[in-house]
């Protein structure tokens, strides 16, 4: 079971709706793969830094792996990875995108891994769906002593007016709400949480931006009429941007926020 709680995760939302939203992504796996960005290699390198020097090849569990956006960066970095997600449809997409990486169905609160079996547990765009007490405890169980918990999110930079308007239309995500309230909670057995920020941009067409919107839990679980209205408003916004006309592309600015905490 995936748990979400607290005002940062949608005050007033019933628990069953939270669970539905957190496990809804498999229905839009193709949109997720097409529309969601990867992660900066520098952010992944920073998260793994505490264990990189002491391990010949870092053993990493990518939890809430989705279609493998973070998994492929870990593989490129030379890590020995296993990917876990509560949704088999997302893992099927991951197996196509990142062949050869073992996959496991499971959640951050109940990892199907032995005690002290990995050097790092990482979650990309996922910890906001996790009960931080249970997730921290379970990450601590599967990590070896001195192992690291790494959390990372790609957040669109709302200082750009058209990006702010796009977010307003799509509705701010649970992750964005959490960041606005100070960031993720990481509890025992972990100590101090360090953080680092990385800024970058991704060139996207109007079609790719729509796929990104369709990959968000709010749209996936919305009623058909609401989904059509949101997509219509997004198309109207994109029609006002000269860069997106005639199949053109625009730079979507991102702020990637990475966090890490070491298990004693």
Question: In which residue ranges do the predicted regions lie?
Answer:
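Conserved class I S-adenosyl-L-methionine
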Residues: 2-55
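Conserved Class I S-adenosyl-L-methionine
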Residues: 3, 187-264
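Class I SAM-dependent methyltransferase SAM/SAH-binding core
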Residues: 59-63, 67-110
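Short catalytic micro-motifs in class I SAM-dependent methyltransferases
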Residues: 125
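A short, conserved alpha-helix within the catalytic core of class I
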Residues: 130-138
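Conserved catalytic/acceptor-binding region of the Class I
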Residues: 137-204
């Amino acid at each position: 079971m995936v748990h979400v709680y607290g005002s940062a995760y949608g005050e007033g939302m019933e628990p069953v709706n939270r669970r539905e939203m957190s496990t809804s992504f498999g229905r839009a796996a193709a949109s997720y793969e097409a529309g969601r960005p990867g992660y900066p290699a520098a952010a992944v390198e920073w998260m793994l830094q505490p264990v990189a020097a002491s391990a010949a090849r870092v053993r990493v569990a990518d939890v809430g792996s989705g279609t493998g956006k973070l998994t492929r960066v870990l593989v490129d970095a030379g890590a020995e990875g296993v990917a876990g997600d509560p949704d088999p449809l997302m893992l099927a997409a991951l197996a196509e995108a990142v062949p050869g990486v073992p996959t496991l169905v499971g959640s951050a609160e109940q990892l199907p891994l032995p005690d002290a079996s990995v050097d790092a547990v990482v979650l990309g765009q996922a910890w906001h769906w996790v009960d931080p007490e249970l997730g921290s405890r379970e990450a601590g169980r599967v990590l070896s002593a001195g192992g690291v918990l790494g959390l990372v999110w790609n957040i669109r930079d709302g200082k750009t007016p058209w990006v702010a308007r796009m977010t307003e239309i799509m509705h701010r995500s649970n992750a964005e709400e959490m960041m606005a309230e100070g960031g993720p909670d990481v509890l025992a057995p972990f100590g101090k949480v360090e953080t680092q920020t990385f800024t970058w941009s991704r060139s996207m067409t109007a079609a790719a931006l729509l796929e990104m919107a369709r990959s968000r839990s709010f749209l996936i679980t919305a009623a058909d009429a609401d989904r059509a209205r949101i997509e219509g408003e997004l198309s109207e916004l994109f029609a006002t941007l000269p860069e997106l006309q005639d199949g053109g592309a625009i730079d979507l600015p991102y702020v990637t926020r990475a966090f890490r905490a070491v298990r004693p």
